[in-house]
Amino acid sequence: MAHKKAGGSSKNGRDSNAQRRGVKRFGGQEVLAGNILVRQVGSKVHAGKNVGTGKDWTLFALVDGVVKYEKYIRKNRVKTRVHIVPAEA
């Protein structure tokens, strides 16, 4: 005969790991070629000059230089674009 009532079970109690998305290098920061600038889903921030786009929409620097973000209007919407201003040799 049990001396304690059985505790109920729950189907909850789990959580997935965070995706760690977002801006990794901000405007004015110096970067090296290959540095990740933005991790994102979809093209929230667009690639500008000297910036490449990965298959998961990750933006990365193609050259050494300084990060520069800009806003521009496209089809009556304000969009964001990121460029790398190359470092002077």
Swiss-Prot record:
Region: Disordered, residue numbers: 1-26
Family matches, as Pfam families: Ribosomal_L27 (PF01016)
Transmembrane spans: none
GO molecular function, one term: structural constituent of ribosome
Listed InterPro entries: Ribosomal_bL27
Gene Ontology CC entries for this record: cytosolic large ribosomal subunit
Coiled-coil regions, chain positions: none
Gene Ontology terms: biological process: translation
Top-rank lineage group of the source organism: Bacteria
Keyword annotations from UniProtKB, A to Z: Ribonucleoprotein, Ribosomal protein
Family: Belongs to the bacterial ribosomal protein bL27 family.
Protein name: Large ribosomal subunit protein bL27
Species per Swiss-Prot/TrEMBL record: Maridesulfovibrio salexigens (strain ATCC 14822 / DSM 2638 / NCIMB 8403 / VKM B-1763)
Lineage, highest ranks first: Bacteria, Pseudomonadati, Thermodesulfobacteriota, Desulfovibrionia, Desulfovibrionales
Gene: rpmA
